[in-house]
């Protein structure tokens, strides 16, 4: 249910940026307060990303107030913080649909709005894209401003610094707004720094600086002295030397919750040439006390009552696959002091909190640095450690060369615990784990496993750990099947499947379902309805070729079932094996199509793409009638 904007009178006057820019500046504080209240009341009704948006309310208002969006380009890194942007760009009354099937996209999404200038979802891409847009604007002679907003966490990634280095080198007009919401760069925020920021963007300082540079351009020793003097003045009170060294004019830090200070500073910066960096300090969860106190807990929230000042207790359910991994990691580390676990800034999401506390000397959070995480794991493995890299499927895409070049070619014993494989649901196309089967199975030396329940997951993790070669265990987001894992850990026979159900009728008139991964319950449900054989393949690579040939020879048709893309996936592996052995058999491959999967619940997406029991039954009937 959408909120009534009549209860937010100032926000009702600023539902699009052009209307926002008609407001007098003294109304912006009031607008920011209403926008924050609207965000709180909206997300609490729908669920979604929360704390980041609360922290960027004033910054969002100021950016749309100063810049002529959408002509001026505004890019949000990752996009968790972009809910206020969506509200101010004509989508307030659709916020009740965010992250739902056929609803608003969870992140900035160009097909949804002209104000969403670049599709995002992963970290640290905005500066590169903004620089490309700045060059394009110059080539086309458009007097367009380009602004990238990036958080201090995303700024730790190598890609961000690659872009900063390039931007500082070619000196194109662009603004990078560093949203520092963890105080990780500087705690030196207050009246002095806000005053200094305004001073450094003011006409007086910049006319002196630019004029002085021109005046002294032919006197190198004096020019160098002047530059050092300016650097020394700024360096005494500004933590921006690194950005200056990269070729940016650094401004800040300023209070990101003082909307008028942000407006004044941005307005001054509009007239600057070359790359500029504005450092704003914000509070994640600003305006909602419990979110300020625990921004990680309130980063993404379920539906809740704001008056309770707490999130609802989750209903008892089966442990998540992330929790199964976390428990295995603790159990294994207790036995193996050489186990070293690596995560690229996903400790909570990957289920590693307890492990990090119990085994701090065996735990490494390398920040948002997927490429480094994989090669760091390779280095650990090369010199005798048993490396475990815990990473989301969609984030492993960012380290594909390292996976091949640094791990697989050297056949190093690195275990990849791949969370969020397959359909993840509400986060949409940037986060679906659709491609890992296809991009892993083509790599020599890799062993790829797909568990169908919690116990299978635990045993596969143990198998990969003991294998002493590159291995991957891919498992889905969310709760498991309710299977209690065996406490004992047993290595599985590599490349061997298990038969879960045999048809009771003549096999030559029936279908065999070859299941890869978490869709096994759907396969079994369908098999009961149509009396089919079900084989849980377990291994995507090496494939249980004997089981495939036996099923093909005994049954009238095969169905392959996976939660990844069909092209190059596990079904493709089955077809390749049949072809190599000269077997001609009717095969229906069920998986994800050649398109990006939008947001919606996992169950909605399974149903839409024919991966639930109903879809499997329909596929079987299309084969055997």
UniProtKB/Swiss-Prot annotation:
Homodimer. It comes from the Bacteria. Pathway: Metabolic intermediate biosynthesis; 1-deoxy-D-xylulose 5-phosphate biosynthesis; 1-deoxy-D-xylulose 5-phosphate from D-glyceraldehyde 3-phosphate and pyruvate: step 1/1. GO terms for molecular function: 1-deoxy-D-xylulose-5-phosphate synthase activity; magnesium ion binding; thiamine pyrophosphate binding. HAMAP family: DXP_synth. PROSITE patterns: TRANSKETOLASE_1, TRANSKETOLASE_2. Keywords: Isoprene biosynthesis, Magnesium, Metal-binding, Thiamine biosynthesis, Thiamine pyrophosphate, Transferase. One of its GO terms (cellular component) is cytosol. It catalyses: D-glyceraldehyde 3-phosphate + pyruvate + H(+) = 1-deoxy-D-xylulose 5-phosphate + CO2. Its cofactor is Mg(2+); thiamine diphosphate. GO terms for biological process: 1-deoxy-D-xylulose 5-phosphate biosynthetic process; isopentenyl diphosphate biosynthetic process, methylerythritol 4-phosphate pathway; terpenoid biosynthetic process; thiamine biosynthetic process. Thiamine diphosphate binds at residues 80, 121-123, 153-154, 181, 288, 370. Binds 1 Mg(2+) ion per subunit. This is 1-deoxy-D-xylulose-5-phosphate synthase. It comes from Alteromonas mediterranea (strain DSM 17117 / CIP 110805 / LMG 28347 / Deep ecotype). Catalyzes the acyloin condensation reaction between C atoms 2 and 3 of pyruvate and glyceraldehyde 3-phosphate to yield 1-deoxy-D-xylulose-5-phosphate (DXP). It holds the Pfam family DXP_synthase_N. Belongs to the transketolase family. DXPS subfamily.
